[in-house]
């Protein structure tokens, strides 16, 4: 949500996230009720690739759709499988296992995200990089922040500047902005302090599409974005015209 001139408004993206969260909650709630008839688990995650993460009293493992434990409850945390690998935590380190519970990528990361389109974001010594499914670095730990890939690009941050990289780890848009949002519908909202900390929109060629004049700018959804301008919260289209 946005707070603008003391008024809180729900954005389109906020509503989408809320709807998705509610759907996932009820799916997990129903699965939990079936799997937990004998009070075997204290928590259950979402089924993915035939398995769901579950928690006993303290530790996590995985069950199949017959609600049998197929990967022992031995982890500090376990996440839903993606692209054949499950992200798990052991001794406060993140690693990845396959459907049989075999370790495929060792436990050596301080933080990580599940695989998406053949790569995963991992953190080591306070910096984020990218690995492939074999655990090889596509991009060594380099950035202080790395957002989820959107439309093939990820927002990254280093030394209080942000830019964008591709899935090869190559810098596509230089780290020359002071703040930014992930790409959506071909455009990204970015902020430049030298432009009075105003926000504008760029395309994937780093060309300015909408000028740096907004106090607040959010990603586009269905060709509409919410912005703040001259003390007013409004919706604009991709030409910068206000939408009523």
Spans of model-derived segments:
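Charged/polar low-complexity intrinsically disordered segments
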Residues: 13-16
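Residue-level detector of conserved, function-critical positions
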Residues: 22-244
